């Protein structure tokens, strides 16, 4: 029986794992995908809006070649954090069910049953697309996540979204269409 199971191996899940380790808890961080799976799925040429120091966890310095780090630098940084802290990770291990057993929680995962006194859920929102329920959104050419502009060459494109990411996608796809 673990003291703590953390679901989600993104930056918040890793920060929780570091705190668990500092407090000598028997813990495990599990994720249905890879380490910082959502960051891996960001567009390849992503540059963060935050400076490197705002993304730091566990007193490990995040050194970037620029004022704002890239996706590649972030992936390397979070691997370094895990190695530095020797975090307990169980990757590619999806949780299918969580049962409250009064004195503890039972988690059914693809690798078997896990039991823990406490759980923290740090799954984020990246894997849950916001669907608009409009005709055509189920077509093969409609994507819910953007990676790069190449697939949109010579196509009319509609971008549904708001904020900085939508503007970045609009600028990137516009440069590939022209």
Task: Tell me what each language-model feature is.
Residues 1, 6-32, 145-178:
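Rossmann-like dinucleotide/flavin-binding elements
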Residues 1-7, 22, 37, 41, ...:
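FAD-binding core/adjacent interface of flavoenzyme oxidoreductases
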Residues 37-76:
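Glycine-rich active-site loop/strand segments that organize a redox cofactor
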Residues 44-45, 126, 163-164:
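Short glycine-enriched loops at secondary-structure junctions
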């Amino acid at each position: 029986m673990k003291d703590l199971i953390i679901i989600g191996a993104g930056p918040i899940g890793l920060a929780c794992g570091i705190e668990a380790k500092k407090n000598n808890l028997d813990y495990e961080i599990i994720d249905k995908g890879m380490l910082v799976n959502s960051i891996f799925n960001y567009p390849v040429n992503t540059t963060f809006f935050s400076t490197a120091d705002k993304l730091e966890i566990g007193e490990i310095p995040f050194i970037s070649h620029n004022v704002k780090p890239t996706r590649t630098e972030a992936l390397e940084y979070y691997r370094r954090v895990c190695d530095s802290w020797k975090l307990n990770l169980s990757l590619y291990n999806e949780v299918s069910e969580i049962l409250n057993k009064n004195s503890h929680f039972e988690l059914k995962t693809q690798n078997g049953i896990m039991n823990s006194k406490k759980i923290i859920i740090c799954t984020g929102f990246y894997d849950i697309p916001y669907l608009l329920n409009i005709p055509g959104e189920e077509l093969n050419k409609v994507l819910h996540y953007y990676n790069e502009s190449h697939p949109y060459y010579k196509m009319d494109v509609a971008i549904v979204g708001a904020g900085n990411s939508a503007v970045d996608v609009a600028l990137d796809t516009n440069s590939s269409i022209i």
